[in-house]
């Protein structure tokens, strides 16, 4: 097995981003999740099927199931003249993932979820996009900090 990914929450968020990106390009949810989790794990003929971590599946399934709601929330926080369609697929996927965790994962403090998605954004996007994602999600967190979890 390679050491490029562990099962830390940060690594699983990154895997969730990869799976969600693949789903946007036509992949099936479970297949995309399995590929994102296992593509760099060395397996032999006798290897067992990799069991997907619940955290990873919860993120991917949750974002997929709440996509329309998340897109509406993102749209309401975009500056005048911007639309969801104008955003890159990478940025939309990162925003959906970050917003979903902030809104629905009670066990993850909002600021932790925000900082974690920014770290993923720095890896898969550029500095400008990471700042944009930080700004939009920070605005969401600051507007209704006690009402964000539902």
UniProtKB/Swiss-Prot annotation:
Domain of life: Bacteria
Keyword presence, 4Fe-4S: no
Protein known as: Transcription antitermination protein NusB
UniProt keywords, alphabetically: RNA-binding, Transcription, Transcription antitermination, Transcription regulation
Any one GO BP annotation for this protein: transcription antitermination
Similarity comment text for this entry: Belongs to the NusB family.
Annotated S-S bridges: none
Record function comment: Involved in transcription antitermination. Required for transcription of ribosomal RNA (rRNA) genes. Binds specifically to the boxA antiterminator sequence of the ribosomal RNA (rrn) operons.
PANTHER family xrefs: ANTITERMINATION NUSB DOMAIN-CONTAINING PROTEIN, N UTILIZATION SUBSTANCE PROTEIN B-RELATED
Example GO molecular function: RNA binding
Organism field: Streptococcus pyogenes serotype M6 (strain ATCC BAA-946 / MGAS10394)
Keyword Thylakoid: no
Coiled coil: none
GO cellular component, one term: cytosol
Pfam families, per the entry: NusB
């Amino acid at each position: 097995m390679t050491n490029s990914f562990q099962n830390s929450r940060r690594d699983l968020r990154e895997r969730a981003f990869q799976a969600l990106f693949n789903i946007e390009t036509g992949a099936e949810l479970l297949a995309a999740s399995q590929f994102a989790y296992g593509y760099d794990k060395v397996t032999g003929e006798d290897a067992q099927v990799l069991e997907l971590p619940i955290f990873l599946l919860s993120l991917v399934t949750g974002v997929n199931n709440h996509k329309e709601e998340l897109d509406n929330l993102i749209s309401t926080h975009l500056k005048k003249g911007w639309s969801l369609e104008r955003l890159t697929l990478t940025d939309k996927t990162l925003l959906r993932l970050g917003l979903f965790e902030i809104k629905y994962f009670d066990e993850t403090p909002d600021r932790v979820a925000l900082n974690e998605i920014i770290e993923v954004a720095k890896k898969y996007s550029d500095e400008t996009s990471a700042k944009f994602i930080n700004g939009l999600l920070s605005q969401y967190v600051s507007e209704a900090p006690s009402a964000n979890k539902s």
